[in-house]
């Protein structure tokens, strides 16, 4: 019974991840892959009873979180470049925040600085060019 429920959950998770394919970019897939790798490693280390289960669950959750954060950051950067003003996305619980701010216009492209916050602390800053 546990195996059947696990397989159903795994198939459901795979379906959810693959259904996002219409709007995803290469960077979203890369974010999901990194999230899956980190999640799998954490799951293996944390689930001492069944390391395979921990790895699979960690990979699934990590892929979803990594892909989602990457997609949100890309959307924020694109909106900031198009509207020429800062854009902020926050998680409902306030634990995560992405802030994208246009820095400089270069022809058809805009340099956007994206800051990632976790629990109110700055964890990452990146600059990227967003072109029309």
From Swiss-Prot:
GO cellular component: plasma membrane
Positions of N-palmitoyl cysteine lipidation: 20
A matching Pfam family: Gly-zipper_YMGG
Protein's cellular compartments: Cell membrane
InterPro entries (alphabetical): Gly-zipper_YMGG
Leader sequence residues: 1-19
Keywords associated with the record: Cell membrane, Lipoprotein, Membrane, Palmitate, Signal
Protein name: Uncharacterized lipoprotein aq_615
Species name: Aquifex aeolicus (strain VF5)
